Amino acid sequence: MLEACESKLDIIKNFVPSWFAAVMGTGILAVDSLLYSSYLPILKDVAVGLFYFNVLLFFIFLVPWVLRWIMFKDNALADLKHPVLSAFYPTIAVSCLVLGADFINIGHNMFWGGVFWTLGAIGMFLFSLIVPFYMFKSESIKLDHVNPGWYIPPVGLIVIPIAGSLIMPHLTGVWHELTVLINYFGWGAGFFLYLALLAVVIYRFILHHPLPSAMAPTVWINLGPIGAGIVALINMVNNSPFITIKEPFYIFSFIFWGFGLWWSLMAIIMTLYYVKKLKLPYAMSWWAFIFPLGAYVASSHLVYKIFKFSIIDYIGFGLYWLLFFFWAITLIKTTNKVYTGEVFKGH
């Protein structure tokens, strides 16, 4: 056990920011299991089990994450300034937002849902400024560094209204107004930052060599802002009494969903290409398969509920099983690498 580690302290020293992507992925799988339990009732029990497991995961990961900033501050700070790894720092804040949604939808606990949402929203606000700031002032970023992982800060902002919109109706006065402001700020800032970065990432895809094998799963992150954006927008519209005409927002969600379907197919094709031509060795980036696809699965169900096109829900349910497969195989691989200590080697 942990034979690949020179010291047990390597667990803390090399605890990369992307670990919380596992919490994001498990949390969205729990929500999707609940959404599709109408097809298979046992999925409701699966959702509850995943929810409790995810809460445990969060606090397990939180310990080395905090200790790293205390014991190996230089390493933690170096990752925050790294042109690739820095984009994964917001995963801890997004994890809080996802857990907030889990507590509200699965745990039926508005208090803890609100606590995690508040922590996540504050964290995302800070990371949405810190991460781009270091990128903007850096003089060493190259085209090699561009990858869909850069979407994570915008995705985190877009995720804010998913649970935040469910909290809005329970507040009054200035707290209600502040929550509305935070939700619309999150979606607006995140969506337009995503559009800007989309152009940069597509530029890299077309005019540069393919992503390294270790970063190949990040192709799936393209689904993150689409799926989360649809879910967040629908939740905001449904919980904003001042929006009296909802249909234009619903139609935009449907159109945006179509863009997501294209990206789903492209991500599958690109993954098969890497598996066949370039290999796809395990890396922590495998967790990039999970949350973005899970967000798109959730968006499929919500779009179906509005337009009542059964084929959309069938597509979502089919992708749910792909999501479950990705999650299971990634969890098994990660557990094995944790046991051997390989995942804690220096990067």
Swiss-Prot record:
InterPro entries: SLAC1/Mae1/Ssu1/TehA, Sulfite_efflux_TDT, TehA/Mae1, Voltage-dep_anion_channel_sf. GO terms for molecular function: sulfite transmembrane transporter activity. This is Uncharacterized transporter MJ0576. Belongs to the tellurite-resistance/dicarboxylate transporter (TDT) family. Keywords: Cell membrane, Membrane, Transmembrane, Transmembrane helix, Transport. The keyword Transmembrane helix applies. GO terms for cellular component: plasma membrane. It comes from Methanocaldococcus jannaschii (strain ATCC 43067 / DSM 2661 / JAL-1 / JCM 10045 / NBRC 100440) (Methanococcus jannaschii). NCBIfam families: tdt. The chain crosses the membrane at residues 15-35, 46-66, 84-104, 111-131, 149-169, 182-202, 214-234, 249-269, 283-303, 312-332. It is a multi-pass membrane protein. It comes from the Archaea. One of its GO terms (biological process) is sulfite transmembrane transport. It is found in: Cell membrane.
